[in-house]
């Protein structure tokens, strides 16, 4: 395990997270018999938590990791009746690699075709806006103006918007940082023209750094889902997908977003 990855044992009790566990105890039905063997075959649920997306997870000054993804992992472990281990990583690409390599049982990912090899996805549980940030003096005023020759866009390597822009851009050039949290600082330091990222992260960066602004609107909608190693099979993927649908329908996902003060994300509609 690399220095950027840490593991935390999470005790499942109402004393640990009263609001989460109260919802878990009342809103979402138990999973079918055999679900624990399919989703947590080692007898513990290893959930990979990516800190690269602040809408889903954060670490506080004391080192405690919390967020919507942690709440969902806690709820799933409670429904399975197994202990929870959080495998914490700093970037989306690390999370993908961790689950593909079966070093975690589940993870939280933006759905993208390039990630489907090796990972089985649920339907999305939240929809997140991807946005652009520029310097105040930039001539850019609209998202449609970004994809032009000579425009350099800073992105987090392996992030959902990196994968999306790698497919969609016709003329602009991508520049990459190891993590999404470093995008705006590297954008400023290296003279890029645009920073791309999750709207909430860019809004937080704009609030603390002078001389930058967000372009209005969004350039993409990120579908955030749960996933597991594809080798677990279709039945395990269906169990995880069913859990996600229950969590959305019960109001659990909406309550978690509200509890963590998340803006720029909405609960995804029910899967058809």
Label each region the model flagged.
Residues 74, 78, 83-147, 213-219:
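Acidic, polar ligand-binding/catalytic clefts
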Residues 93, 110-118, 164-167, 188-220:
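A ligand-binding cleft/hinge motif common to bilobed small-molecule-binding domains
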Residues 30-110, 247-250, 259:
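Extracytoplasmic small-molecule ligand-binding "clamshell" domains
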Residues 2-16, 26:
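N-terminal secretory signal peptides and thylakoid transit peptides that target proteins
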Residues 51, 127-137, 199, 203-245, ...:
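Periplasmic-binding protein-like
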Residues 27-32, 160-177, 214, 245-272:
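Ligand-binding clefts/hinges and TM-proximal coupling segments of bilobed small-molecule sensing domains
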Residues 67-79, 138, 144-150, 158-159, ...:
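Extended ligand-binding regions for polar small-molecule ligands
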Residues 46-54, 63-79, 111, 131-185, ...:
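Bilobed "Venus flytrap"/periplasmic-binding protein-like clamshell domains
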């Amino acid at each position: 395990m690399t220095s950027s990855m840490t593991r935390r044992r999470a005790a499942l009790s109402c004393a640990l997270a009263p609001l989460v566990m109260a919802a878990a105890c009342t809103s979402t039905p138990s999973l079918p018999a055999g679900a624990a063997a399919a989703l947590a075959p080692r007898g513990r649920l290893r959930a990979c938590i990516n800190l690269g997306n602040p809408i889903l997870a954060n670490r506080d000054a004391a080192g405690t990791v919390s967020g919507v993804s942690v709440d969902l992992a806690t709820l799933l472990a409670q429904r399975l009746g197994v202990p929870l281990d959080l495998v914490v990583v700093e970037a989306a690409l690390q999370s993908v690699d961790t689950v593909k390599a079966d070093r975690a049982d589940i993870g939280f990912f933006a759905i993208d075709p390039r990630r489907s090899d090796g990972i089985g996805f649920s339907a999305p549980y939240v929809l997140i806006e991807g946005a652009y940030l520029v310097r105040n003096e930039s001539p850019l005023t609209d998202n449609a103006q970004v994809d032009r020759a000579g425009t350099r866009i800073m992105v987090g390597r392996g992030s959902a918007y990196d994968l999306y822009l790698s497919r969609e851009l016709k003329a602009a050039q991508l520049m990459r940082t190891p993590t999404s949290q470093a995008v705006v600082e590297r954008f400023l330091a290296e003279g890029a023209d645009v920073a791309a990222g999750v709207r909430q992260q860019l809004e937080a960066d704009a609030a603390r750094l002078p001389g930058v602004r967000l372009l209005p609107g969004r350039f993409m909608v990120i579908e955030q889902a749960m996933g597991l190693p594809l080798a677990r099979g279709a039945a395990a993927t269906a169990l995880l997908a069913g859990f996600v649908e229950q969590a959305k329908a019960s109001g659990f996902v909406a309550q978690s977003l509200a509890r963590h003060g998340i803006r720029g994300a909405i609960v995804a509609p029910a899967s058809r």
